[in-house]
């Protein structure tokens, strides 16, 4: 299974870069089949999806999540429709000017310093799809990606992965190497990453700190851009196809759609 995942990761990267889903499809089919077989052995007699949920977050089940998502959908979808129909969308074109990658790396460093991430225990790398991994609390590695025409994509990735990073860095030394290392559940881990990404780094208070730093790093690109314009652009809400690029309001729709597909 580990070999399959390694091979599939390479093919996924190739398929993503060339927009060639058929290249990755057979590997995805094999992964799904392997997961079904694995869950059947680990949880005999248990529904396959319930078994997978148990692996990712102990205690979750379809019986619990179906009414939860139905409630979220009933309340969230009308709000999204109202926002889209209001005709008062923020202009985020200012984020899609050419922002040199080297400057964006400086912005990443600014965000990491703002979050208080210990650089002696954490490094940042560049990948196709951002993630965070840890070997122990003294060796945590976060990653990001850079798009020259989308400066905040990287910044929010660093804020998100920085949340994961802070969770790992603040584990107790006594938990290193034990079954309790790595976080209580993936659900709790994700709550920390999205807390820093959305509640903190989209706030007016953070934008007030970010704005002068962006003017310092990108003086040409930030000409004519006010702090209010940056704040509104950072909080623009619009349905999109990419989960990791989704705004705070529409992001849950991606989770609900995936949930229905996976079931």
Each language-model region and where it sits:
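Active-site recognition of the HExxH zinc-binding catalytic motif
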Residues: 43, 146, 153-173, 190-197, ...
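Glycine- and acidic
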Residues: 88-94, 140-148, 172-180, 241-246, ...
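Contiguous, non-catalytic segments that form substrate-binding/exosite surfaces or channel walls
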Residues: 4-151
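Acidic/polar loop patches that form or flank catalytic/metal-binding clefts of enzymes
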Residues: 119-121, 174-178, 201-212
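Secondary-structure capping and boundary motifs in well-ordered enzyme cores
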Residues: 27-30, 100, 134, 138, ...
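A structural signal for the main folded, soluble domain(s) of proteins
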Residues: 14, 71, 101, 161-162, ...
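Active-site-adjacent bridging/hinge elements
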Residues: 132-141, 165-172, 227-236
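Long, amphipathic alpha-helical stalk/connector segments used for oligomerization, subunit docking
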Residues: 203-263
